[in-house]
């Protein structure tokens, strides 16, 4: 799989994970202010903006690139917050919901491509 295919597969798995945990998916791959939000979901009193990071790992869960969440740098966080603000300014119906920025890590086997583990970090970053 290419890195793009790995990323898209990770996003697909993240959507399934969120739905299984009673999140309502509002949008996927939403482009806002020249940035992309992987998943926008509604959950209880929250409007949740989710960044999905996927890594292929060996059987020991090791990746040469560190944890997926470590790829969400301060710069990336700022861009996601800008995109979330842009989305909320255009979608007033979610204005009463509390915004939350989550990260979902997806680990895939580098041998089989099958999912090994998903970590969900709620309220992972903010202003």
Outline where the language-model segments fall.
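Solvent-exposed, charged helical/coil patches
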Residues: 1-15, 19-20, 66-70, 124-125
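Conserved catalytic cores of phosphodiester-cleaving nucleases, focusing on short active-site segments
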Residues: 18, 39-61, 80
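A short acidic/basic microdomain associated with nuclease active sites
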Residues: 19-33
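Conserved protein-kinase catalytic-loop segment immediately C-terminal to the catalytic Asp
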Residues: 38-41, 105-107
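Catalytic cores of nucleic-acid endonucleases
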Residues: 54-109
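Short, low-complexity, polybasic intrinsically disordered segments
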Residues: 105-127
């Amino acid at each position: 799989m290419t890195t793009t295919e790995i990323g898209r597969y990770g996003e697909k798995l993240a959507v399934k994970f969120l739905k299984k945990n009673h999140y309502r998916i509002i949008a996927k791959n939403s482009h806002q202010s020249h940035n992309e939000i992987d998943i926008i979901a509604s959950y209880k009193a929250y409007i949740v903006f989710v960044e999905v990071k996927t890594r292929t790992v060996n059987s020991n869960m090791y990746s040469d690139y560190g944890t997926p969440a470590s790829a969400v740098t301060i710069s990336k966080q700022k861009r996601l917050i800008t995109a979330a603000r842009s989305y909320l300014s255009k979608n007033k119906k979610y204005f009463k919901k509390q915004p939350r920025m989550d990260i979902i890590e997806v680990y895939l086997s580098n041998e089989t491509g099958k999912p090994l583990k998903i970590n969900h970090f709620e309220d992972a970053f903010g202003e």
